[in-house]
């Protein structure tokens, strides 16, 4: 996965590949993790000859809703050093409780519902995430634009044990007074979610 957002993995690993070299082996590798994109402050680091380029664990305590930047520096057996471009991963809700309540229709309804929520935003948010869970299948649209590229979300779950949720970065899709053409104090947004039965109830 490249720059994943909103996952709650118990174990997080980083992998790397060195290209455009005739060297045959890694002599040293260093992994750096920071909360800052410029790595001006290092939160955690690990260095050694035997770091696993296929999957090296990031062994530090992570917080919910947090973006961590990762950089790898590799020195090969010819003395050449390569530094990766910064990558990142962002944690999800983790153990944070859900504040919302389930939204549904009447039990006897047989149609596929469409739920709509209008909300206003003044200033551009520093970041905005949509954390969404649906029993069955869902598709979300923000201001008429489909959220994400996935289809048939949230995929298969064992509903007796868990419900999957997805995380979407919607920062650039939210209308605000900074990117809204009309002279208003707030900009109105609309979130629309359509639901289908999926694996949860009935056949595909």
Predicted feature residues:
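Recognizes extended acidic, P/S/T-rich segments that occur
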Residues: 24-67, 73, 77-83, 102-103
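A short beta-strand segment in extracellular, disulfide-stabilized domains
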Residues: 11-15
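Compositionally biased low-complexity segments at domain edges in trafficked proteins
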Residues: 100-114
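Acidic, Ser/Thr
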Residues: 17-22
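Accessory beta-strand-rich segments of carbohydrate-active enzymes
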Residues: 16, 50, 67-71, 90-95, ...
């Amino acid at each position: 996965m490249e720059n994943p957002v909103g996952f709650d993995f118990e174990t997080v690993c980083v992998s790397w590949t060195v290209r455009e070299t005739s060297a045959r082996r890694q002599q040293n590798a260093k992994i750096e993790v920071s909360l800052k994109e410029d790595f001006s402050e290092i939160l955690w680091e690990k260095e050694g000859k035997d770091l696993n380029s296929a999957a090296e664990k990031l062994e530090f305590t992570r917080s919910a809703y947090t973006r961590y930047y990762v950089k790898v520096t590799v020195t090969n057996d010819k003395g050449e050093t390569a530094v990766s471009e910064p990558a990142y991963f962002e944690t999800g809700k983790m153990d944070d409780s859900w504040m919302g309540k389930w939204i549904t229709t009447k039990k006897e309804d047989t149609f596929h519902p469409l739920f709509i929520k209008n909300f206003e935003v003044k200033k551009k948010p520093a970041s905005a995430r949509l954390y969404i869970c649906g029993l069955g299948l869902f598709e979300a649209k923000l201001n008429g634009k489909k959220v994400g590229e996935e289809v048939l979300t949230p995929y298969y779950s064992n509903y007796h044990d868990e419900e999957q949720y997805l995380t979407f970065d919607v920062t650039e899709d939210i209308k605000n007074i900074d990117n809204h053409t009309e002279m208003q104090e707030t900009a109105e947004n609309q979130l629309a979610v359509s639901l289908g039965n999926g694996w949860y109830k009935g056949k595909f």
